[in-house]
């Protein structure tokens, strides 16, 4: 079973007298910075000079804001809370020459360390604290005296105190109130990518589109198809999210139970499982990472084309029209 750390297992004293530099002030960055500051930690936010709007927002929130290299200079913990694909360049240009002996390089996702896009010097600690929820939720739960479950991992333990410092950071953002699960950079990275590709993003999106196309091709109205295969999905996902898969089965009709349990395996077959294994292998071997890195180096031609195709799918047009009928939703 996984090791889970709670409030009693973490001590903010490991951040006493230290400066935590938060690189970025987006979804996670602003939450980490504000929570740590409210926990009594000395925080500085590092931002590019050209990002005036974010700079002003951070200062309005009461943060000390500096240019990237200045913020990192002399910091004891440097948290890289910017998108994966820009991290390596920012690290090379603004961070690596500012790392002092015994400092900690902190991440919220393991991609760049696991796939060697960032290779820290041996004289620093490397750790990860990854909340399993978006930044606004991390902030809101902290303010309410609660927390969001998170992951913690140590990749490099130069000082011998990397886990203690990482847990102090986790406590500072409120994570230990809920529980912090110990993992590794390898496990977090590979399972995160697998979930995105096979289930959460790739698998669900393709299932919805194919279901919609099947109904429309058979002559059913696209409006009805949209409601049945996309709109109602939230109702089912909420039931699973709140109480697990069996909770969903307990809540739906007997007809839905029987039809789902007898037909679902005809959609997701052993061939599907084999493709899942292939995708996992591509992640484990680094094949996907190399593909994605090269795609970015080439200017993202495949990525941009695929995104355009998604945007132009018929389900998007009909969805926009139907959502206009739903006053409880934010307008597109």
Curated annotation (Swiss-Prot):
SUPFAM superfamilies: 6-phosphogluconate dehydrogenase C-terminal domain-like, NAD(P)-binding Rossmann-fold domains. It comes from the Archaea. PROSITE patterns: KARI_C, KARI_N. GO terms for molecular function: ketol-acid reductoisomerase activity; magnesium ion binding; NADP binding. It is an enzyme of class 1 (oxidoreductase). Its cofactor is Mg(2+). InterPro entries: 6-PGluconate_DH-like_C_sf, KARI, KARI_C, KARI_N, KARI_prok, NAD(P)-bd_dom_sf. Mg(2+) 1 binds at residues 192, 196. NADP(+) binds at residues 25-28, 54, 84-87, 135. Involved in the biosynthesis of branched-chain amino acids (BCAA). Catalyzes an alkyl-migration followed by a ketol-acid reduction of (S)-2-acetolactate (S2AL) to yield (R)-2,3-dihydroxy-isovalerate. In the isomerase reaction, S2AL is rearranged via a Mg-dependent methyl migration to produce 3-hydroxy-3-methyl-2-ketobutyrate (HMKB). In the reductase reaction, this 2-ketoacid undergoes a metal-dependent reduction by NADPH or NADH to yield (R)-2,3-dihydroxy-isovalerate. It is able to use both NADPH and NADH, but has a preference for NADH. This is Ketol-acid reductoisomerase (NAD(P)(+)). The gene is ilvC.
């Amino acid at each position: 079973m996984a090791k889970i750390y709670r409030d009693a297992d973490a001590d903010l004293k490991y951040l006493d007298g230290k400066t935590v530099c938060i690189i970025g002030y987006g979804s996670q960055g602003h939450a980490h910075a504000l929570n740590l500051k409210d926990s009594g930690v000395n925080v500085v936010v590092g931002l590019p000079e050209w990002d005036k709007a974010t700079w002003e927002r951070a200062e309005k929130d009461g943060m000390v804001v500096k240019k990237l290299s200045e913020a990192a200079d002399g910091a004891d913990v440097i948290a890289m809370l910017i998108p994966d694909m820009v991290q390596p360049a920012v690290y090379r240009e603004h961070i690596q020459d500012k790392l002092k002996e015994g400092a900690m390089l902190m991440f919220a996702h393991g991609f760049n360390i696991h796939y060697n896009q960032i290779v820290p010097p041996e004289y620093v600690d490397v750790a990860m604290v990854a909340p399993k929820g978006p930044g606004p939720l991390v902030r809101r739960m902290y303010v309410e005296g609660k927390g969001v479950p998170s992951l913690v991992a140590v990749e490099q333990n130069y000082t011998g105190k990397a886990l203690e410092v990482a847990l102090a950071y986790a406590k500072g953002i409120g994570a230990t109130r809920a529980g912090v699960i110990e993992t590794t950079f390898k496990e977090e990275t590979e399972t995160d990518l697998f979930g995105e590709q096979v289930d959460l993003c790739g698998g669900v999106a393709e299932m919805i589109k194919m279901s919609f196309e099947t109904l429309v091709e058979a002559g059913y109205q696209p409006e009805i198809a949209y409601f049945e295969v996309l709109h109602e999905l939230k109702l089912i996902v909420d039931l699973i999210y709140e109480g697990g898969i069996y909770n969903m089965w307990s809540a739906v009709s007997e007809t839905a139970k029987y039809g789902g349990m007898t037909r679902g395996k005809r959609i997701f077959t052993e061939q599907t499982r084999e493709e899942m294994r292939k995708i996992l292998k591509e992640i484990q071997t680094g094949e996907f990472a190399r593909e994605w890195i090269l795609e970015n180096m080439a200017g993202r031609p495949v990525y941009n084309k695929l995104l355009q195709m998604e945007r132009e799918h018929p389900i998007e047009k009909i969805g926009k029209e139907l959502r206009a009928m739903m006053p409880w939703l934010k307008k597109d």
